[in-house]
Amino acid sequence: MAPGRKRGANKAMAIGEMRLGDLVLAKVKGFPAWPAKIGQPEDWNQAPDPKKHFVQFYGTGEIGFVTPPDIQPFTSETKKKLSARCQGKTVKYFSQAVEEISAAFEESQKQKSDIVGNEALLNAVEPSVTKPKYLNQASSDGKSDKFSSRADPCLGKLVENNGAEINPDVGEQDSSISNNRNTSPSSEPVEHGSPDPILKVAVDDKIDNVTCTDHSDGTGNNLVNDQRIIRKTTDDSNKRCKDEVRAKRVPDSRAATDNHILGPNQKLKGSIKGQDHGSKKGQDHGCRKESSDSKVVTDLNIASSKKPKELLKEKKKRFENELGKSASGADESKRAAKRPRSEDAKDQKQCKSKRLVPVGEGKAEISDSTGVVSIFKREIVLGISALGGKNQFDKDMVAYTKRRKQTVEHTSVSSFPGSLVKEGANHPEQKISSSSDSDIKVQAAQLPKRRRAVCIYDDDDDDEDPKTPVHGGLSNIPIASTDAPKSANASHNTSIKAKLLAGSTDSVKTGKVPLYKHNKDASLALPDSVEGYNSRMGKPFKALLQKNIKPILRSPKNSYQLVSFKKQVTGQNKTAKVAGAGMPDSVEGPSNSSYMGKPVIKLPPQNVKQTLRSPKKSPQLFSTKELVAVQNKIAKVSGAGIPKKYHGDSSKDVVAGSDRVSSSHSQTANQRSKPAFGEKPTSTPKVATRLDVEVSRDTFVNLSADVIDVNQENGNAPLFSFGMSDSSSSCMKDLIAAAQAKRKQAHSQFSPFVNLDHNSLNIDSMQTSKSPFMVQNVSSPAADATLIVAQEHQEVLTPSNHGRQSSSSNQAGTEENEERRFSSGHRSVGGSLSGATEAAISRDTFEGMIETLSRTKESIRRATRVAIDCAKYGIANEVVELLIRKLEIEPHFPRKVDLFFLLDSIIQSSHSQKGRARSLYIPTVQAALPRLLGAAAPPGTGARENRHQCRKVLRLWLKRKIFPDFLLRRYIGDLGASGDDKTVGFSLRRPSRSERAVDDPLRDMEGMLVDEYGSNANFQLPGYLASLTFGDDEEEDLPSTSQEVKNTHMEVKITHMEEPVLALGKLEAHDSSSDKPHCVVDVNGGLEMEDASCQLKDDVCGIEAKEDSPATTCATELPSFPAGSPPLPHESPPSPPPQPPSSPPPPSSPPQLAPAPPPSDHCLPPPTAPLAPAQSIALPPSSITRPSMPSHPSLPLQPGFAPPAYPLLQHEYQISMQRDHSSIATSNQIAPVPVNAAHGRHADGGVKSEYLMPQSSSFAPVGMCSYGEPLPFISSKQLEYGNSDVLFKQEASSQNQQLRPINTSFLQRPMIRNLAPAPSSHFPLPCRIVQSEPQRSSFPHPYHFPSQPVDGRQHMNEEWRMPPNGCSADPQYGAWIGVRNPFPGSRTVTDGVFQPPPERPPSGTVRYQLAANNLQGGSTISGNIASQMLLSRPDVPSAAQYRPS
């Protein structure tokens, strides 16, 4: 049983039957059948739906997809019904819609009447020219008549003569064209509210030669009076006639000149004599038969005034000449013709509307370029301007007004030899072009043979990659629509001569490949030499284009359809492809083989449309791919309207940049100065400006020096390196490399980031010229390479910047400008189709991330990923330059560190990868490392933290062997040798872990091998890591000599922890600068490594301190304080609590510091006083030799303490000790040594083993942790009060100091910033000292303080107990003696036993009451064990006990 019929199936029109621009009634749910016309979804950025028709509704201007069953054709009957219905109450806008569609329908009907003449022409054409197949197609198109009638008076009916014979080649092309058109989104329906698409038939048919009878005098046949000679040069293809086919005169000259009257000189290649709109596609195709490949030249001598014979003669002559020229393109034409045939069927089905294509060499080329080109939009848009009569003109006017939105003057296009103007059949452009042609009234004789009338058909722009609305929107192409009325009138008189540049290799090239294919990205191919052309109106072609351009912009749909100029220079392969409509960059002269200076950026029509609508979104304007390697000289111009050069008078119009790139600067300037067409020099710039502003803002064609390295001599070189296909990616890299090299030269002198060459841009000229495109490369090729298309750039760049900008004086402003230019310019490089576009996007993204970078792993990771992506596009050098420039201009040091961390992350990530990222970033950064370090870690005290972080990163690189060791070591040494660490105040020390910001990537890195950024996190044993990796960090904060013990790995091997006393020599401290043994010396509270071979002994010798002897056994002299060290505080600390009665009076004068030699094992220097040797404290050898302060380099300043300078050298420290009236006794035993903590030097947290005393004579141990191994605290030396290093010189009494520790406390607090609040008298001793007990002669208890790993960070918050008589089992964790006030819960050591400290020990808690004046100064405390006591301030009484809060 047969299936039931679909409801409405009988009314439904098959999609294949519907043509673009057909008038229909579309039923939408909730509304009556609404007047609409078939449109192209691509014009509206809509994806085509194969099962539905895309319609544009009249009245509301809305669009939608409607199923075929819901669509019925709009006919006379339907019109009557709707009119009657409108008499009553109707839905809002319905009446208006009916009126609009009725008007469109009437126009189409008029066109049908005109098309009759075209049928006659088609019939006149030899059958070989037209094939019945096409006739059939035309008949199928017959349905489209209503469409054409509605959409285009000329086109709509052009094809009505279905029976007319159509040139088989043309027919095929037409069909293919129609298919393509259907496919192409640019079909006229896109127009809002314009019921009539401009000749849609032409678009659909893509018939180059199809002419609308509308333009005919109105009789429809008058134009035919002129004989149209069609010479069909067929390559030996079966499809095409091999012999030239001369079309017999077609009584209907109108048909021949449907689009525009063809003067005797005019040749319609693709046009078929019988271009019958009635025949529609068939005829149109027939007309197109001439399609470029076939090189059929149909000379429609339509000028009514001229006799057909005369016209024929003239045309013959011209044609023969042209044929000779175009002979070379014959083969290509064949191919093109073949393609169109296959496509025609599809096209006819999909697009009934026919495209009128003006005859011209351009068409032939188009067809040559694979009939597809002609089919799509290559077809020269029918020059509607060639209207046969007044009626035609009136019709054109109407159509024009309706279609005002977009049209490129075909005349202007045609004026370009070999240039193809594509115009949607439904676009008024065709009409306009024809009309403009008539207006131009340039006799065939006037036009050079090369020149040919071109109509731009953009209907297929979407299909064609090359077409880009933005490109189309460029100011270069004037819209013919403005001229349409004029041209319509003149069209009768004027014949448009479409010459085939047969000889031009360009045409051949394009002919071989469909222009669409050639210009996937650029819809326009400008003839290389358009300069000489004048529009029919007598105006420079470009001027016309400029006018048209603006409207195009207004109607983005059509903009991409603007003119696609294929500028063909005979004999030259150069073709400048203009992506935008009508972007002839340089109309200057054949000399400029590529209009635009050769760069034409192509974008797929869809992209173009989008760009027009949202130019900012079109960073893709540049279709990099389409730098057509195929065309040796094709320069891609971005849709953004890369400045084109017009030889025209107006410099404004000229976009010198592109030409300039190709040509010498002077030439460029000249070209710029010239207006594109010599018409309204200002108008073009305005258009360009608009385009630039809209498009270029986001899609500036910023041809940074790096982006474009244009060889001036090679005008043909692609203007944009990024407009390149993969094949040209290497080229782009070369260009970028060259630009960067130049940039580097400019920047070699500390100039920030990428300063384009001084000559790179002449912004002033741009501004003065007012041409948005006027980017003038001042003097250098790099400058040429740099083009800024957008006015925005011009605005951004001030003339001062023009002066450019390398000068350091203008550096900041210049940098900003450059940055702006750089980022925006890269944006301009956008082309979704091209890697260059993606590269530009990635670069811009990276630049944005730099601006918002924070020191968080996530932020750095994101930016790193983008940087790696940039490397994939070959712009790693730009990324590095961006970083350098940002580092150089960044005023805040922490931000510099963030950026350097980002660089580190990029380097580590690229190092871990194989391939391009690694190959690009590593060498690039290596070469730029001096600049990077100079910018990230500048000299000066304020950048100390930066240098520290940079050294850390460099050591990491060294460890991972990312860069050569010698190089990294040199830089590390340079950073370490800056010496400012010694002079920088303690306040600049690196914050402790607890103080770091929560987002600090280094905060939680104890367990990581270092990938702070989370990308390469390798975990190690925390102890090992801490010692190797982070202790280093802390140490760096400590002042260090150039030999700073910041060995890259901080490998301090404390192998002999078991031994209470180890030779310092056993500690292996690998200094970055040298491996010489170092002596750890307490310098104002900071442990410093000093070269002291004498001190490197297996046995730790007691240091004999002599009261008045400044000499030290270490043979170190007491240098004066470093110039940068802060002076000792002059103000006395708050009055200390009263001393215990037994405490000696403050010394009258400070004892001279007697530096203690490295104590030999248990070797006690003879006490100056009878102090019991027990009081000497064994100094752990490790502390003596520890390479540098481990992770405690920085202790927060205690209130009351002057900010300590970074630890000074031992000499300096000793001096300070002298000044503080203290001396250090270095011994293996810990003895109470009062030190005035106020001497800020010791405050450095790095002093792990020193006792920091508050400013009172008493002191608190800063860190009792032996640096190397735990050492028993054995009194190796008596504390000599006067002779001892640290204790106040009491009156020469030989009494043993009576130490009454009241709650001595050892706080295990590495990195404690605050000095122990305990009264300075508090002297936590591991030794048993009873408050009431006089000092013990010795402290037999060996307190083995576990060697402190280089990094004690992990122990920061931990409190370690020291067993009374043993070494700490864990060598990794040294017992740290807290510097802070003992807090509740903290352990205090009393009598060698840890005890919970009092909540806050009173000021006298641990005060050692000096029983005798000669209280033996505490023996020196080993570096980690607080062996070196901070000196008490001289002005503070020795007994004074000051406990800072």
From Swiss-Prot:
Tissue expression per record: Expressed throughout young primordia, and vegetative and reproductive apices.
Top-level taxon: Eukaryota
Cited InterPro entries: CID_dom (IPR006569), ENTH_VHS (IPR008942), PWWP_dom (IPR000313)
Region (Disordered): 133-197, 211-302, 319-356, 409-439, 460-491, 641-685, 797-835, 1110-1203
Subcellular compartments: Nucleus
Keywords: Developmental protein, Flowering, mRNA processing, Nucleus, Transcription, Transcription regulation
GO cellular component, one term: plasmodesma
Composition-biased stretches (Polar residues): 173-187, 211-225, 660-673, 797-814
Residue ranges occupied by any CID domain in the UniProt entry: 838-979
Pfam family, one: PWWP
Compositional bias ranges of the Pro residues kind: 1124-1170
Disruption outcome: No visible phenotype under normal growth conditions, but the triple mutant plants hulk1, hulk2 and hulk3 show delayed flowering.
Any one GO biological process: mRNA processing
Chain intervals with Basic and acidic residues compositional bias: 228-257, 274-293, 331-350
Segments forming domain PWWP: 20-77
CDD domains, alphabetized: PWWP_HULK
Function summary: Probable transcription factor that acts with partial redundancy with HULK2 and HULK3. Plays diverse and essential roles in the control of plant development, physiology and flowering time.
Name under which the protein is recorded: Protein HUA2-LIKE 1
